[in-house]
């Protein structure tokens, strides 16, 4: 994330993390405080939530809500080696990492992660807070629900939908719409665990 922000021309002022890490260095940038300190920087800085999908999007969403309540603005970051069509839309707080592609007519919502070398094809919809992992392929007109996770190298066939909060395992191939919340894996992708 840091290298993507640097390549996009952002000046990074510092990092917020947990209290135990204050003063630590991450790729040349100091951890200057915790999320509770966000309001101190809200007037002069835009924020990017760098935490990805860890078992669910709940922790990431909690941080986004906390920063929003503190009056923070969010940057949309597109790495210099990524391609985003001028006919695509990206929501506030979304990040598109190196070598990722977002093609014409695609709509990527707020606070999404389009990870390294992921491909979001024409007319795809990626809803709020979804994470499209490294090398995933979302074919034309497919849809990814809010807070869903599409694992590394997974493929969504054209026009299929993945439901909100669902997880698609690495390397899985989604050939039909999977609207029931759950964890899916395989080729073709099958439900392996229902979400409660």
Which sequence ranges carry the predicted segments?
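Short, acidic/turn-prone active-site loops that include or flank metal/cofactor-
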Residues: 17-21, 36-37, 189
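NAD(P)-binding Rossmann-fold cofactor-contacting core
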Residues: 8-26
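Glycine-rich adenosine-cofactor-binding loop
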Residues: 1-5
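Structural signal for interior beta-strand "rungs" in well-ordered beta-sheet cores
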Residues: 76-185, 189-192
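Conserved acidic residues
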Residues: 13, 45-46, 92, 146
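Cofactor-binding loop segments of dinucleotide-utilizing enzymes, especially the Rossmann-like FAD-
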Residues: 17-18, 52, 79, 187
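Phosphate-bearing ligand-interacting subdomains
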Residues: 23-83
């Amino acid at each position: 994330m840091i290298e993507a922000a640097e390549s996009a021309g952002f000046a990074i002022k510092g990092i917020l993390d947990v209290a135990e890490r204050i003063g630590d260095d991450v790729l040349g940038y100091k951890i200057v405080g915790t999320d509770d300190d966000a309001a101190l920087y809200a007037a002069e800085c835009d924020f990017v939530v760098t935490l990805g999908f860890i078992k669910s999007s709940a922790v990431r969403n909690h941080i986004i809500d906390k920063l929003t309540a503190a009056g923070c603005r969010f940057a949309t970051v597109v790495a210099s080696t990524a391609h985003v069509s001028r006919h695509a839309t990206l929501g506030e707080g979304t990040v598109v990492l190196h070598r990722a592609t977002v093609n014409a007519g695609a709509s990527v919502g707020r606070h999404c992660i389009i990870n390294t070398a992921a491909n979001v094809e024409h007319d795809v919809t990626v809803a709020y807070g979804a994470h499209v992992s490294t090398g995933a392929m979302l074919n034309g007109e497919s849809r990814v629900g809010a807070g869903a996770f599409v694992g590394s190298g997974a493929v969504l066939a054209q026009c299929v939908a993945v439901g909100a909060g669902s997880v698609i395992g690495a390397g899985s191939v989604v050939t039909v719409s999977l609207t029931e919340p759950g964890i899916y894996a395989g080729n073709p992708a099958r439900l392996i665990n229902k979400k409660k």
